[in-house]
Amino acid sequence: MKIEVIKKEENLLEFYLEGEDHTFANLLVETLRENPHVKFTAYTIEHPITMARKPRFRVVTDGEITPEEALEEAAKKIFERAKEVLEAWEKAVKS
């Protein structure tokens, strides 16, 4: 995974997330949307063949937090949810 920043302003961040596809992109956008300070977030895959594993994201916040802070919070939430799934799986397998 590699992040390539395209545009960075006070409350706006646009970037490519190389090496990912719709699976992680959807998860990240949905998690960002849970944050009340995120006013807009979306991603697009600019070309289905040449850019299939390079979604372009746009994150806009209300100014209370930066887009970078929103992304950090979202990443932490995703990590915690993954841990919960793993723990539930381990518990189910032991039963």
From Swiss-Prot:
Q: What is this protein called?
A: DNA-directed RNA polymerase subunit Rpo11
Annotated GO biological process: DNA-templated transcription
> A Gene Ontology MF term for this entry?
protein dimerization activity
**Record function comment:** DNA-dependent RNA polymerase (RNAP) catalyzes the transcription of DNA into RNA using the four ribonucleoside triphosphates as substrates.
Sorted alphabetically, which keywords does the UniProt record give?
Answer: Cytoplasm, DNA-directed RNA polymerase, Nucleotidyltransferase, Transcription, Transferase
The protein's annotated catalytic reaction(s) are: RNA(n) + a ribonucleoside 5'-triphosphate = RNA(n+1) + diphosphate
Entry EC number(s): 2.7.7.6
| Principal subcellular localization | cytoplasm
Q: Which residues cross the membrane?
A: none
How does this protein assemble? Answer: Part of the RNA polymerase complex.
Output the Gene Ontology cellular-component terms.
Answer: cytoplasm; DNA-directed RNA polymerase complex
Task: Quote the subcellular location field of this record.
Answer: Cytoplasm
Return the NCBIfam families for the record: PRK01146.1-3
> What Pfam families does this protein map onto?
RNA_pol_L_2
| First-tier enzyme category under EC | transferase
Task: Give the SUPFAM superfamilies listed for this entry.
Answer: RBP11-like subunits of RNA polymerase
Which PROSITE patterns does this one have? RNA_POL_L_13KD
| Family classification | Belongs to the archaeal Rpo11/eukaryotic RPB11/RPC19 RNA polymerase subunit family.
Q: Which domain of life is it from?
A: Archaea
